[in-house]
Amino acid sequence: MSSQQWLGDGTARRWRELHGESDWDGLLDPFDLDLRRTVIRYGEMAQATYDAFNHEKLSPHAGLSRFAARRFFERAQLPGHSAAYRVARFVYATSCVAVPEPLILRSASRARRCRESNWIGYVAVATDEGKAALGRRDIVVAWRGTVQSLEWIKDMDFVMVPPKGLLRDKASDAMVHRGWLSMYTSRDSESSHNKDSARDQVLSEVAKLVSMYQDEELSITVTGHSLGAALATLNAFDIVENGYNRAPRAAAAAAGCPVTAFVFASPRVGGHGFKRRFDGARGLGLRLLRVRNARDVVPRYPPAPPYHGVGTELAIDTGESPYLRRPGNELVWHNLECYLHGVAGARGGEAGRFKLAVERDVALANKSYGALRDEHAVPAGWWIPSNRGMVRGADGRWTLMDREEDEDSAE
């Protein structure tokens, strides 16, 4: 599949509009077709972090990516992305404060590679082919969330702290969730993966790519789901607040390239002071589109007040889909593939009814759970590694081999 076929006709010409230059005014209702495709495209880049994540606790590679950076999108079965983007770096996170177990997966193997760190996402950049199709050189940061039980969001404490290091001045009253900030900024000098924080890993790679392509038209796009959406919100703000969207040779007063976050099922990130500071960064090129499923509980946490949402909301309701079981359950309502199914069909028919306006295989909704009606004859949770990573050797013995050897080549 070529990049142009995958994107649709309007993306290159309208990319600034689709990335929120006018805050998506007039594009959400009725739901613009090119915007649907754009939201789905970045959602698939977030979904790839789930599809690649090794959550087999018995594996020494639990918590890492099963896919190598060089073949990442190909292995994630995203041929359009494979032509349009290359992964420049994998990103790892840890936390210096206690967080619920689903947020940091710990291997039970004595030979485990990661003890207190997990692979949390990647930085990618448009290829030359992708640049031609997209209309600019796009830098993407994709953050992984959690696919475990949703009890973690209810079990967390909701303490807010100042976002130290993220703000240029110390007088701000901005406050953010302690757990999200810790995942974003924590480092561990004893770790093989987190001597630098997730924040430092991402910002150094973004700075490198902005410098490398500073003579071209650039955009920075950040995406994530659930926990990944919270990290994406902090990251997008951080990039703009601290000028990482500006080329090194740019004049002091020069505008940086646009930074847009497309986030899904996002918990709230901070209080009113953070919202005010986030809104104030619009003038520096920051935009955020927050996709929320009507029945999903995660966007309702942490409670408001004192927490406040940021950005522009895109509301969907997967309960209106004729393809999905009714009423469903919390896991299905929160599932990213079901979100993308909802984006493909929300308000796509007459009188705002659900109808797939984008041809997207409904089988994807059953990738992790049994969301589809039985009449579609798609097994529940069908996305699993072949033989769960077990490989038969020449000696007839079966061995767990669930990691491509050049995984760390993008670090």
UniProtKB/Swiss-Prot annotation:
- Cited Gene3D superfamilies: alpha/beta hydrolase
Q: Which GO terms describe its biological process?
A: lipid catabolic process
Q: Which UniProt keywords apply?
A: Cytoplasm, Hydrolase, Lipid degradation, Lipid metabolism
EC identifiers of the protein:
3.1.1.-
UniProt GO MF annotations = phospholipase A1 activity
Q: Which GO terms describe its cellular component?
A: cytoplasm
Q: Which InterPro entries match?
A: AB_hydrolase_fold, Fungal_lipase-type, PLA
Which SUPFAM superfamilies does the record associate with it? alpha/beta-Hydrolases
Is Cell cycle tagged as a keyword?
no
Top EC category: hydrolase
Active-site annotation: S226, D296, H334
Q: Which Pfam families match?
A: Lipase_3
Q: What does this protein do?
A: Acylhydrolase that catalyzes the hydrolysis of phospholipids at the sn-1 position.
**Annotated family:** Belongs to the AB hydrolase superfamily. Lipase family.
- What is this protein called in UniProt? Phospholipase A1-II 6
Organism in which the protein naturally occurs: Oryza sativa subsp. japonica
Lineage runs:
Eukaryota, Viridiplantae, Streptophyta, Embryophyta, Tracheophyta
